[in-house]
Structures are given as C-alpha cells and as structure tokens.
Amino acid sequence: MTVPAVTAPFLASAALLVGAGGAKLWRPDDTARALRAAGLPAHRRLVRLGALAELIVAVASVVAPGPLAGALVAAVYAAFTAFVGTALLRGWPISSCGCFGRPDTRPGLPHLTLDAAATVVATWWAAVAPHHIDRLLTPSPWHGWPLAFVAAVVAGLAYMVWTNPLERAAR
C-alpha cells in the first residue's frame, strides 16, 4: 500500500489546528471579539472551551491520523469555512477572525479558500486514510521525514496567508 497523496496536506491542516487551538486557548480575546461582531456567544471561557476541543482534535489527528481524525478535522474546518463565508456575505465588521489568538488578517477570500481547501483535504483523508499510517511510513524512504517536511512547508505557507505578517508589519 502506498501513502495517499493527500497525506502531507492533511497533516499540515492538522498541524495548523494545533497552533490555532493553542493560541486561542492562550489568548481568546480576538476570537471573542470576532464572535461578538457576528452576534454569537463570545465569552472568553466559551472561546477557550472551543479552542481546547480544536486542540484535542488536532493533536489526535497528528498522533493517530486515521479516518475518524479526518472527519473531525473536516468538521472543524467546515465550521471555520461557514463562519468566514457568512462574515463575508453579511459584511460583519470583523477586523480579525482571531484564528491564531491575536490580530491577524481580516477574513477574506484567501482565508475562505484555505478553510474550504482544508475541509476538502480532511474529507478526502477521511475517505482514503489507512488505519495505521505508521505501517506505511516505516518502509518508506527515511521513514516519512520527507513527508513531514512537505507538511511543514505547506503549513507554514498557509499560516503566512492566514496571518499575513507583512501586512501586520506595515501597520
């Protein structure tokens, strides 16, 4: 059996959730402001509870990336896609979605596209994921390190789109 082509993008999506969930757990204020602007419940404890759930799903997906993990990651990104899409359609006054627990970029088309792509990737992974990925990676070249590298690069590029450090530096 070969490693599915969607493995690196899925692991990148899960890794981004680790960072985002951890950041929101640590700094929930910007996410709470975004939820408040949308007219949704926005208490800091509620944001932290959601961030903890996000972090649990993400860590489980990195540690044991099977079909269930893919379905859970897809559900998280589908919720993000719905939130950002609704914010754009309704013109909610959100200056930052708070994805990474601090002011980053305004929700926009790149943000929506990445969330939707991560939803598709995670859904695809849920459909094709092997139950024991370690059995696939052990005989592969360098035990999957090239795959981990590609996942890290994809995650880093997506993080740059979501947080736009150049825009923040110009402020």
What is the predicted role of each segment?
Residues 1-171:
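Membrane-interfacial helix-loop segments of redox and metal-homeostasis proteins
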